[in-house]
């Protein structure tokens, strides 16, 4: 039987327990962990890179508003490298109410995502 991916959040005051859970999930044969942006997905992914050996993990999802493509590209490249390629970057546009809270004007989602990915790809020579 193929096991599904699990989803975990780096809850404040529970981060060490979450990493222990990830190690246990790997031991039991789960293939991957989804890391929602709730609770700092990038920080969790860096930690997962260091406490697991085979488990794949990914952001689910990292919003494109509020952080530059250059910064996200650099972070994703770092995690990809230290994890031996087990990290995947999941991107999304979120929704208008959330984006407004960031003080950002949301454009057409497909156009915004296309422009973001284009900017992200331009960073490849610097980020890896």
Where are these regions (language model features)?
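N-terminal beta1-alpha1-beta2 module of alpha/beta enzyme domains
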Residues: 1-59
